[in-house]
Amino acid sequence: MSLEPADWSLVAALGANLRYIEELEARYAADPKSVDPALAALLRGAVLPGPATPAAPKSGGGAGAALESLSVPAGVPELAFAARSLIEAYRCHGHLAVQLDPLGLSAPIGHPDLLPENHGLSSQDLDRPAPGGLWFGARAGEQPTLGDLHTRLQRAYSQHLGVEMAHITDPARRRFLQERLEPLENRFVDDRTAQLRILDRLIEAEVLEQFLHTKYVGAKRFSLEGGKALIPLLDFLVEFAGEAGVEEIVLGMAHRGRLNVLANLLGKSPRQIFAEFDDLDPLSVMGSSDVKYHMGYSTDVRSQSGHKLHLSLAFNPSHLEAVDPVVIGRVRAKQRRHGDVGRQRVLGVLIHGDAAFAGQGLVAETLNLSGLEGYRTGGTLHIIINNQIGFTTNPTDSRSTHYCTDIAKMLEVPIFHVNGAYPEQVVYATQLAMAYRQAFHTDVVIDMVCFRRYGHNESDEPGFTQPLMYQKIERQPSERQLYSSSLVARSVVAESDVAEIIARKNAALEEELRLARNKGERPRVEWMTGVWAGYCGGTDASVPDVDTSVPKERLQEVARSITTLPPHFTPHPKIERLLQQRAAMGRGDVALDWGMGEHLAFGSLLADKVLVRVSGQDSRRGTFSQRHAVLYDRQNGTPYIPLAHLRDDPKQQGVFHIIDSALSEAGVLGFEYGYSLDYPDGLVIWEAQFGDFVNGAQVILDQF
């Protein structure tokens, strides 16, 4: 039957479906056959007029109420609009129906728009065929009912993994996620090899924790028990990153699970970890009073697919989240050093706690840097070990938001919420997150909801403040036990094989402990390696004085370059006079002022091909109008940086970066400190806008 062009007043009443109509129009224009025939008839020659005023909706709410209120033209496919409205509801709100808590103590809040009846769909409608072309989970040759569609939407968006993406305004980015979530319906690829690899990593994590728990009773280690799915998450992240072209990963994390990450991801020798627990010679390393769960480490690994990656875990203090900007600064410096212009080869990974991610201001400062030209790194992967408690503080007392991750919505990035008791979904979330980061060069967040089996540390008694939670935790099987039971039930592995793997890994740790104690293993901290290998280190007194003078001719050459403007550049009249004054200073006619002296100092380094990077609030002009490192054409606003043009060929001088930073002290100083760690052969400067503003970055100064 041929239909007349649609009455688009129907569309005006559908709110969220305006986006759907726009997508339909685009698909129909590209290929009319790609759209359901009934909907294609609506689009044929249709033009959207101005807004229409729908009738008052009946009670009940949701898009279904709007549908009921309309006088729908004969033949308009109401089911298609209702089905699409239900699909959009799951895409927007499905995460609210996910059972995220592995303990089952908190139920999902749900959302009324996830109910078919709130979209005008009756129980009889659910037995009718679902219109085609509405979502990405359709399979060739099948004809599911609307009830089937609802079930599959629940599996895709409301099972053990939920995705927040409604806050992302770019439809291409939402579509990227929908195309990957809907066909698989929230299931990791049914691959026995991958499942056994997940199990093996869980066993490694569990065996190490239990070994330390029995051999070093009461010693603080901030165990990962309750959140051990972090280990397969990171293991597969390395695999996915290698396949995506990443060559180096810089990680930052706090104390929770750090020893497990060091041993089972970075490959730190267990006997070295045991030596740190035994602490036979506390004065064997320079520096004192640091602890084993602050230590950093670097190593080269090869993924199972054969890709070589360099992994670095940054040293960190007990001050939560202080390491975040330091890691991102290191990533940016490595990208510069490796010529990673596309920001695809070096990846930053930050592992947070739920209370700290919501509570620490440095998190927001670091997130805000992610899109800024002077600080962007192509996207950081944020992983929250969400054990639903901050030391002794409940979430209701530590944040004002539903999720601990809500601060990240300001970046319009996807946020994956996953139940840590389901490691296959944890790995699937990691795969999606990595793919999204590489495709769109933005941050991505994984909120892994888990629990903490012991107190904040192993000598703490959590039952004082969370008695009901810890009664439940005492009865809760471990993640390894749950997953191995699941694989046994699916005939993927036999119980005897699991027991054999556990026994073998325990025996290996026993041998490592025997060797550590028989040989008197001492803790080792390696520094002055990599880009620092050519530096001697030590105290200031042990470093010989060197001549830092610069020939007069070199300074005059720099002065001429920085006071010469390109043709057709029109400076502000006051800037023109300033350049004339600086030219006179360069000739020696008048004494240098601070601004000119600084330019000559930077220029002398740049002439020797040394990188110079300066950032701070209003640093390009200078707070007191003293610097003017960036000049702007008065006619068209085009910027010109004299210090970047000392030579006709930019390869014949050092790179000069002068950056107006975000209005942040701690975050920006942390970033620049991190940058300097991987650029010892460059001059990296953070400038406090006023001298006393430096105390806004006090944690960075004190701890790093």
Q: Where in the sequence are the language-model features?
A:
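Subset of Sec-pathway N-terminal targeting signals
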Residues: 3-46
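Glycine- and acidic
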Residues: 5-10, 23-24, 213-225, 247-251, ...
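Extended, charge-enriched "interface" segments that sit outside catalytic cores
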Residues: 31, 49-229, 246
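Flexible, glycine-rich loop/tail regions that form catalytic "lids" or insertion modules at the edges
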Residues: 78-88, 95-130, 134, 206, ...
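A structural-propensity feature for long, helix-poor, extended segments
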Residues: 116-152, 290, 393-398, 412-415, ...
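Active-site pocket-lining segments that scaffold enzyme catalytic pockets across diverse folds
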Residues: 207, 211-271, 577-583, 592-606, ...
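Glycine-rich ThDP/TPP pyrophosphate-binding loop and its adjacent helix/strand module
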Residues: 229, 233, 247, 314-518, ...
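Cofactor-binding active-site loop characterized by glycine-rich and histidine/acidic residues
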Residues: 247-412, 416, 624-679
